[in-house]
UniProtKB/Swiss-Prot annotation:
Name the record gives this protein: Protein-glutamine gamma-glutamyltransferase 2
Subunit record text: Monomer. Interacts with phospholipase C; promoting alpha-1 adrenergic receptor signaling. Interacts with PLCD1.
Gene that this sequence comes from: Tgm2
Catalytic activity, reaction form: L-glutaminyl-[protein] + L-lysyl-[protein] = [protein]-L-lysyl-N(6)-5-L-glutamyl-[protein] + NH4(+); L-glutaminyl-[protein] + serotonin = 5-serotonyl-L-glutamyl-[protein] + NH4(+); L-glutaminyl-[protein] + dopamine = 5-dopaminyl-L-glutamyl-[protein] + NH4(+); L-glutaminyl-[protein] + histamine = 5-histaminyl-L-glutamyl-[protein] + NH4(+)
Active-site residues, record numbering mapped to chain: 277, 335, 358
Cofactor: Ca(2+)
């Protein structure tokens, strides 16, 4: 009778498997695999080698605290002639004496998470059990049988593997790209993502069921949506929008997700202060990409927050056009969420592909502050019954805006306002390029098209179906040159009278600082004039906006809202026009000193010229970049920076990975907040 088979050690082939599974950056000390794909391991036996005729090898793989075969969290499988795609299986690749090379495969629908892999050997009546090791299983966009399969290699690289990108801010007429370090493969981030799953309320309520449901990207996406904010749980970020961030970090100051997730994990899942929509979206993007779900950050300009699902945002104003009060139903200058790519077997065919997921805490969904995933195609078709939260997202891109003027006798009169259209310039980063891609067409049919009317009919969007009132008089706000922070500049109310009659009017122009979520600040410019509109004429009325007026009240959004109200007393009519202005920050210049080589020190020289007429104090540069810095670095400048002078610092980098990387920079001082810059750096082999 053959002696018992004894395992000496197991080599999980971490580096080789990491290369094959596109997880090399995660496979420093642990095995990270993508489901539905073969992987290798090597068994070293002592005494004698494996003999197929007398030895039986049985493998076990378990995940979660209470694994079971019924829940899909426990599997037992034996050696077979070849691995079976789509199931737990193992086969022999090669044997050299006491060394056995094996190939294993996981199902394409296995729950993601940490697994324990074991081996049982049996020879006749003898048997032993061995612990082979642990591995982490992720979703697999390269596997056709996986629910997150994406058939474009360029898109897989962009939406799963790329660790840097851009988030779009500013205003619809001045879109600003902000660099961001997602850093999903940086040290400790995968552990933070797995911890996020393990402290979510659904896991704490029913651990076995939660682990089982982690097979579905729909479920995982919804969990991540709820856990990135901390409104119901031990989530990552605390939101704040009142411009008081003294006991934390301003949302505008962040330049990446890595520092946020590390802080959350290292402080025992305590909320990180503070986030706003793009920070919530960026952190969700990092987590979902890390777990293997193709994801991108999306920005919607003129985004509606409709609380009562009537697809209508109503503003009540006094006779001067001023809002009676700030309210919760508002139009945000822009709003960010993420889209993740997946199939939707729970929905009708055609609703697979990009799914909107919004982690910013706005409204509760099934009792939790989360939103989505909802099919972007369902939004485009106006199918508001679709899971999850279709009506809320539809309103974000389609709600109508009605302005009411409350007159002196208390009655209200509807004002014409053709300047504000909800859901414009929906933007995301292009695949493989540092450019913006407009994806509005994926959410909406062309304005005025028959398809658009069909969608509004299906969604019972009655206000959008009503005919727009035309008076023959039109007004829009135009801008001049030089809209940079620190400058005085002009804006213009451009008024056209396309009728044969003369019009006696009063024009009230007002400029106020504004936060990106629509909350107004103090006035920084006004004009009140009477004018006559001659028949078939055009008029351009200027409003001068001075730096000394806006400098003390501009928020970190760098936004000013200009409103024009044209009143025609004889006709008792009001015409409203608005425009949001983004004031450009000064440019951050980045020079790379030395030859960029792997595992060799590199120096970045970072500078900024003071554009203001005053000195800058308390200047701080903060830099980070996946593959360039192990952690975020900050450099303080003790001396004041006089007007017109440049402030310059040097930062040491240590590139660990070859290829293209982004160095992301933030600059703060007493008068300039959250100035961003970046530099692409190509790292060559040592």
């Amino acid at each position: 009778m053959a002696e018992e088979l004894n395992l000496e050690r197991c080599d999980l082939e971490i580096q080789a498997n990491g290369r094959d599974h596109h997880t090399a950056d995660l496979c420093q000390q642990k095995l990270v695999l993508r489901r539905g794909q073969r992987f290798r391991l090597t068994l070293y036996f002592e005494g004698r080698g494996y003999e197929a005729s007398v030895d039986r090898l049985t493998f076990g793989a378990v995940t979660g605290p209470d694994p079971s075969e019924e829940a899909g969290t426990k599997a037992r499988f034996s050696l077979s002639d070849d691995v079976e795609e789509g199931s737990w299986s193992a086969s022999v690749l090669d044997q050299q004496d006491n060394v056995l090379s094996l190939q294993l495969c996981t199902p394409a629908n296995a729950p993601v998470g940490q697994y324990r892999l074991s081996l049982e050997t049996s020879t006749g009546y003898q048997g032993s059990s061995f612990m082979l090791g642990h591995f982490i299983l992720l979703f697999n966009a390269w596997c056709p049988a996986d629910d997150v399969y994406l058939d474009s290699e360029a898109e897989r690289r962009e939406y799963v593997l790329t660790q840097q990108g851009f988030i779009y801010q500013g205003s619809v007429k001045f879109i600003k790209s902000v660099p961001w370090n997602f850093g999903q493969f940086e040290d400790g981030i995968l552990d933070a993502c797995l911890m996020l799953l393990d402290v979510n309320p659904k896991f704490l309520k029913d651990r076995s069921r939660d682990c089982s449901r982690r097979s579905s990207p729909i479920y995982v996406g919804r969990v991540v949506s709820g856990m990135v904010n901390c409104n119901d749980d031990q989530g990552v970020l605390l939101g704040r929008w009142d411009n008081n961030y003294g006991d934390g970090i301003s949302p505008m100051a962040w330049i990446g997700s890595v520092d946020i997730l590390r802080r959350w994990k290292e402080h025992g899942c305590q909320q990180v202060k503070y986030g706003q929509c793009w920070v919530f979206a960026a952190v969700a993007c990092t987590v979902l990409r890390c777990l293997g779900i193709p994801t991108r950050v999306v920005t919607n300009y003129n985004s509606a927050h409709d609380q009562n699902s009537n697809l209508l945002i109503e503003y009540f104003r006094n006779e001067y056009g001023e809002l009676e009060s700030n309210k919760s139903e508002m139009i945000w200058n822009f709003h960010c969420w993420v889209e993740s790519w997946m199939t939707r077997p729970d929905l009708q065919p055609g609703y697979e592909g990009w799914q909107a997921i919004d982690p910013t805490p706005q409204e509760k969904s099934e009792g939790t502050y989360c939103c989505g995933p909802v099919s972007v195609r369902a939004i485009k078709e106006g199918d508001l019954s679709t899971k999850y939260d279709a009506s809320f997202v539809f309103a974000e891109v389609n709600a109508d805006v009605v302005d009411w003027i409350r007159q002196s006798d208390g009655s209200v009169l509807k004002s014409i306002n053709n300047s504000l259209v909800v859901g414009q310039k929906i933007s995301t980063k292009s695949v493989g390029r540092d450019d913006r891609e407009d994806i509005t067409y994926t959410y909406k049919y062309p304005e005025g098209s028959p398809e658009e009317r069909e969608v509004f009919t299906r969604a019972n969007h009655l206000n959008k179906l009503a005919e727009k009132e035309e008076t023959g008089v039109a007004m829009r706000i135009r801008v001049g040159d030089g809209m940079s922070l620190g400058n005085d500049f002009d804006v213009f109310a451009h008024i056209g009278n396309d009728t044969s009659e003369s019009r006696e009017c009063r024009l009230l122009l007002c400029a106020r600082t504004v936060s990106y979520n629509g909350v107004l600040g103090p006035e920084c410019g006004t004009e009140d004039i009477n004018l006559t509109l001659d028949p078939y004429s055009e008029n351009s009325i200027p409003l001068r906006i001075l730096y000394e007026k806006y400098s003390g009240c501009l928020t970190e959004s760098n936004l000013i809202k200009v409103r024009g109200l044209l009143v025609e007393p004889a006709a008792n009519s009001y015409l409203l026009a608005e425009r949001d202005l983004y004031l450009e920050n000064p440019e951050i210049k980045i020079r790379i000193l030395g030859e960029p080589k792997q595992n060799r020190k590199l120096v970045a020289e970072v500078s900024l010229k003071n554009p203001l007429s005053d000195s800058l104090y308390d200047c701080v540069f903060t830099v980070e970049g996946a593959g360039l810095t192990k952690e975020q670095k900050s450099v303080e400048v003790s001396d004041p920076v006089p007007a017109g002078d440049a402030v310059k610092v040097r930062v040491d980098l240590f590139p660990t990975d070859i290829g293209l990387h982004k160095l992301v920079v933030n600059f703060q001082c007493d008068k300039l907040k959250s100035v961003k810059g970046y530099r692409n750096i190509i790292i060559g082999p040592a």
